[in-house]
UniProtKB/Swiss-Prot annotation:
GO terms for molecular function: 5-oxoprolinase (ATP-hydrolyzing) activity; ATP binding. This is 5-oxoprolinase subunit A. GO terms for biological process: carbohydrate metabolic process. InterPro entries: Glyco_hydro/deAcase_b/a-brl, LamB/YcsF/PxpA-like. It comes from Acinetobacter baumannii (strain ATCC 17978 / DSM 105126 / CIP 53.77 / LMG 1025 / NCDC KC755 / 5377). Forms a complex composed of PxpA, PxpB and PxpC. Its EC number is 3.5.2.9.
Length: 254
């Protein structure tokens, strides 16, 4: 059994710092790097890209709605052409920086509201899928495990990897509990670590309503910007190793 560990990185903006990139990068196998639309400035993004290359971490484009003020967490009703152009712009920008650093973008993981919206909105999902195919049909799409997007993207010809979240609570339908609700984000490192192992071995987790919810995940997202993120990431990695679950990139395994 193996699993990939990913994290959202490159999200600092000028003097405003977000996350713990230097500490999280040695733990993960895939880096979802901001592309400037929800967070990240060119210099900071390039530094994160170079560090990822140095550590042999796979680079992915963390594309978003154009929403710096809302950190990409606000829904936006964009036209199909707008969304396609936005996604193309972001992938190509990050891929250019990756090329300079001696690497390339190998997958796309939408961020925040865009991620949640295309999990169920077929029209916006189609725009994102088409943008990825226009740029490079070999790119892998990271999608919420169990969502309609997984099948939609596969039917469209994309390689898809299903993702689960280590520190997020789930509704019984497999969707993420809104961050606005109490209990949406989990903070107990030991509990989260054992929950990740249980999820992988048993194929699901207990929802916020106490119902077993099936989740088949190929990659686990570790958030680097929450309280205790470093301790939690280390605990998760240690628990995976303890249970003989290999940690390796999902690229070429999608």
């Amino acid at each position: 059994m193996f699993v990939d560990l990913n994290s959202d990185l490159g999200e600092s903006f000028g003097s405003w710092k977000m996350g713990n990139d230097d500490q999280i990068l040695p733990v993960v196998t895939s880096a979802n790097i901001a592309c400037g639309f929800h967070a990240g400035d060119p210099l900071g993004i390039l530094k994160t890209v170079r560090k990822a290359v140095e550590l042999g971490v796979t680079i992915g484009a963390h594309v978003s709605y154009p929403d710096l003020v809302g950190f990409g967490r606000r829904n936006m009703d964009l036209s199909r052409d707008e969304l396609i152009a936005d996604v193309l712009y972001q992938i190509s920008a990050l891929d250019g920086l990756a090329k300079v650093a001696g690497s390339k973008v190998q997958y796309v993981k939408p961020h925040g509201a865009l991620y949640n919206t295309i999990a169920h909105d077929q029209a916006q999902a189609a725009a994102v899928i088409d943008a990825i195919k226009m740029y490079n049909p070999e790119l892998v799409l990271v999608a919420l495990a169990g969502s309609n997007l997984v099948e939609q993207a596969r039917v469209a010809g994309l390689k898809v990897v299903s993702e689960a979240f280590a520190d997020r609570a789930y509704n019984s339908d497999g969707s993420l509990v809104s961050r606005r609700l109490e209990g949406a984000v989990l903070h107990d490192s030991a509990f989260v670590a054992s929950r990740v192992v249980s999820m992988l071995k048993n194929g699901g987790v207990e929802s916020i309503d106490g119902v077993f919810t099936p989740i088949q995940a190929d990659t686990i997202c570790l958030h680097g910007d929450t309280d205790g993120a470093l301790e939690m990431s280390a605990a998760i990695k240690a628990e995976l190793v303890k249970n003989n679950i290999e940690i390796r990139p999902f690229v070429n395994k999608a």
